[in-house]
């Protein structure tokens, strides 16, 4: 026959196991343990934060929220990528996780895996936006 102390210990252990399982389920549902997520806000034609750090070779999910009443874009890449988009006439981007259109007052989610350590810019190349300061930087850490 179990003593009251053993029963309390057993109940406490059972409760601890259930609580641990519940916390693990919540953490998994919240995305903890999944790919890193970085939120970038667009307000007054500026990116916040204007600099982020990511690990090389790991998928990173970016949630880009446009709080402005005008459209923007988020182009991430090296100088060659940025130069291409500066001279490109296509303001609508579909299917490329490193070049996304962000309509006014909406959010867009994209996932990017950076394969080389270093620095890349994220810029909005819609007319006048880069000159106004819509530029940010990604530092890709080894």
Question: What is the predicted role of each segment?
Answer:
Residues 3-15:
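Bacterial N-terminal signal peptides that target proteins for export
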């Amino acid at each position: 026959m179990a003593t009251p102390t053993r029963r309390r210990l057993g109940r406490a252990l059972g409760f601890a196991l259930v609580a641990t399982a519940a916390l693990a389920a919540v953490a998994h549902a919240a995305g903890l343990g999944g790919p890193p997520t970085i939120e970038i806000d667009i307000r007054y034609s500026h990116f916040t934060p204007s600099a982020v750090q990511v690990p090389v070779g790991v998928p990173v999910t970016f949630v880009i929220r446009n709080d402005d009443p005008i459209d923007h874009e988020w182009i991430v890449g090296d100088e060659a990528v940025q130069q291409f988009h500066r001279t490109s006439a296509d303001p609508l981007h579909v299917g490329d996780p490193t070049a996304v259109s962000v309509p006014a007052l909406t959010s867009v989610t994209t996932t990017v895996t950076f394969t080389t350590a270093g620095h890349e810019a994220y810029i909005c190349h819609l007319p006048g936006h880069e000159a106004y300061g819509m530029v940010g930087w990604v530092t890709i850490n080894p």
